[in-house]
């Protein structure tokens, strides 16, 4: 709790994060706090999250969108693709920009955020974004792999780390 206090009345910020259970009472409480002046912070804006077996659950972004719509206030996201989060992660790992690789399954958060920071990007097709979705984006990852497991291939891993590719976009699998 260093540096912050959790309060029920008149908080400076309402932080919305991932959760498996959400109750309408909590949403109403957050909405009223924001309408009384609290700022809305989102830990991420993912609209949904894969849970396996081809199934999904609503993500943090779905709940944030509901509260934004109800309050007319826009959240500040500190998660992907926020430069704040990307920069903090890189600095925490003590890496230079050209040494940083982001492996992710979502074009609109993982790849967008990392690409905008100049990181090498690897999209894995085993999560949210599928191959047929790629044409809708105006940007592309540096590498596309079927599964994160493919990074166990030593040759591929070395190519990703060194980013020595003949083409900007490498499809593997």
In which residue ranges do the predicted regions lie?
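Asp-based, Mg2+/Mn2+-dependent phosphohydrolase catalytic module
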Residues: 1-173
